[in-house]
């Protein structure tokens, strides 16, 4: 008889459900993230982020977390490293700007956002070094080194035999500190984290999304409320003048973008 293939899990069983496979979780999060991303014109990037955000759970150390034999394991950063590899961001001169945003969103979906310049060297070392353990979270990476990543890639391929990396918008140079890229990262991050949370909550309560959905947005009414709120903040803010100037610029840029088709 052939060797039995291992099943990798994303969540252990509780009083609401049995153990949930990583395949099921990734598929559901990718689907919901695409739905959220479509609302901001980032359907593909959000779907890609959702589809690999827990790649790092294809790992003995993370499976040990579920069984109680391990703790302090970071699966998010190895997931980001795999997406970084899939997008070939280490070799391209003019990178997929949305790809970088997706990597940043995946890396931060549990412990907070980190910019690509701050983590790129670590991602590359994690992919190649069996000894790398310098996660910003202070935890042990669920995967490190070529052998562990290769085993995880084989398990992922068994779960998703038709997977292929989608083209994520057109190539353009990414300028350090550009507001548009910063906002793109945060919007993708929001899509991913919301999808991840909603899927997990729906595992416990299948009616979660229906219960927590809101009526269609009345954009004009909400914009008026936002303008009143922001006007009050400008009058009463005690923050540094330069910080407020940056906030006003972000607000103005968002307004300008909102006027575009």
Predicted regions and their residues:
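Accessory nucleic-acid engagement/destabilization modules that flank
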Residues: 2-17, 22-233
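N-terminal pre-P-loop "Q-motif" helix
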Residues: 22-25, 240-261
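Short glycine/proline- and acidic residue-enriched helix-loop micro-motifs
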Residues: 236-237
